[in-house]
Amino acid sequence: MDTLTHVLVLPEALERLDSPSIIIPRTANTSEEVVPYAHLTDLTQSLQHDLATLGISVGSKVAIVLPNGLAFVTVLLATIRQRAISAPIHPNSTREECKQIFSLMTPDLVAVMPSEASPAAAAVLAAQDLGLPVASCHRYPQSGRLSFCLALKLVNRGDETSNPSPCMVYSRDHVLAEDKVLELFTSGTTGAPKSVQLTHTNILVAMRIITSAHKITFKDRSFLITPLFHIIGIAGSLLPTLFTGGCAVIPASLPATFWQDCQDYSITWYHAVPTLHHLLLSFPMPKGGVPATLRFIRSGGSDMSLDLFNRLQKLGVPLLEVYGMTETAPAIFCNPFPVTETSTAIKRHPGQYPIPDAVDVMILPPERAPGLEPNGDLDGIENTEPVARLTKELGVKGEICLRGKNIMAGYTNNPAANREAFLPNGFFRTGDLGVIKPRQYLALIGRVKEIINKGGEKISPAEIEHVARLHDQVNDAACFRISDEIYGEVIGLAITAKSAITITAVKKHMRHHVVMFKVPDKVLLVQEIPYNRTGKPRRTLLSEMYDRGELA
């Protein structure tokens, strides 16, 4: 890969390669599919023409409601080539969740699979509610060099008053580094998702950090088992593989034969959140043990317990942890791949990462406090001049603040969130607690935010509370985090009821309104919800009370 490539468009040199870019493993109903780079480029260009025909151009937004697979990859790349913005959406989102996100981003097109294009599909219903056009990504057999092609077929025109005209098809030379590429949505403490837009430059900074730290080359094969609607799936796994000329193996779902598949497909690395690592360790190994082709395994997205860390270390494969956020581009803090497997390699510690040259890191200690306890209640500890407290001093605990070309410009159309997230000197407040260690390592020690991190899925307590209060028998609700050995954190929900109500009824209500991973794991009936002096529910206190057994 040309390390000076300034845009996320497949280098033209790769168009002539017959080496595989994507492999879709066989399933019970389908055969294995190997897609060379030449074929991937042709598929991408074909879909780019379809997008142009549908009126997609510079700055247009395409909501990609597709599962992991070839269709997702090609629609993503085609949108990038057309200088438009890709907005990946969880394919299992409910109608209400899709409608909320579509209202926030106003997509010019919603892309779905043919099976998802039925009038009853959640994304289609949400698009119809808002008058948005929907296109399904169809596969057609053909003769010649390519055995099949992909095409976007309009299945719902949306608002009848809109009839977009065909647009220019852009070449690679037209694409600019400042073009926006991705729009993703993060959970906010107010409950409403916040829109994050990233440019080519934002993502390329992260990709260069990743490929350099992990020494990823065209010889590598990644096993992509993380969702592509997450930043780590797209920019932390898929794109680093493709832009080094490697091969991404993308299963339709997580196979129980994972380790055998790693051996069969000569996988050299994979990424998983700690929850998924727990599950993978329960899967059977091939007769020869851990596949010999594995160079490293990678983890990120949530905290890793020391027990899991030690169990993964026993596999005998280098374990590389990464840390980043949607707002900062993914995995900007990477454990480097060891030069050797001997004692010269750096000893690993969970939650510690070298600070890259491309990212400026400072710590914001709290006012009137010598240290900050992880997940502590921060009410009233901030002052009006946090910039003066920023420090690079070793050993000082506080909020991690970052600045660099990888950082988003700001939350889209959300000045209030931007005032809260950015300091006057441009540093972004991550909401994570850390400390700078000797040798310029960053150690994570906790979180300021109340966001719940369930196995890498970020959940806003305010969103869960809002949905719970929609039940006509719920008087009040407070959502809080519960520590969990497998997921790291799970969702607790304390409610006060207007009259008799069952926990089963509350969970059924929640399942109707939110995607499954947001349904509370524990629902507790309480006499009163504790609030602080400013009227905010004391979620941290509820977590502490639960830990002490006071909310059983």
From Swiss-Prot:
One of its GO terms (biological process) is fumonisin biosynthetic process. Disruption phenotype: Impairs the ability to produce fumonisins, but accumulates two new metabolites, HFB3 and HFB4, which are biosynthetic precursors of fumonisins lacking the tricarballylic esters. Pathway: Mycotoxin biosynthesis. AMP binds at E183, L184, F185, T186, S187, G188, T189, T190, G191, A192, P193, K194. PANTHER family: ACYL-COA SYNTHETASE, MEDIUM-CHAIN ACYL-COA LIGASE ACSF2, MITOCHONDRIAL. It comes from the Eukaryota. The keyword Lipid metabolism does not apply. This is Acyl-CoA synthetase FUM10. Keywords: ATP-binding, Ligase, Nucleotide-binding. Residues 463-536 are annotated as: AMP-binding. Acyl-CoA synthetase; part of the gene cluster that mediates the biosynthesis of fumonisins B1 (FB1), B2 (FB2), B3 (FB3), and B4 (FB4), which are carcinogenic mycotoxins. Within the pathway, FUM10 is involved the addition of the tricarballylic moieties to the carbon backbone. FUM10 catalyzes the CoA activation of citrate to form tricarballylic acid. The biosynthesis starts with the FUM1-catalyzed carbon chain assembly from one molecule of acetyl-CoA, eight molecules of malonyl-CoA, and two molecules of methionine (in S-adenosyl form). InterPro entries: AMP-bd_C, AMP-bd_C_sf, AMP-dep_synth/lig_dom, ANL_N_sf, Pcs60-like. Belongs to the ATP-dependent AMP-binding enzyme family. Pfam families: AMP-binding (PF00501), AMP-binding_C (PF13193). CDD domains: FACL_fum10p_like. Its EC number is 6.2.1.-. GO terms for molecular function: ATP binding; medium-chain fatty acid-CoA ligase activity.
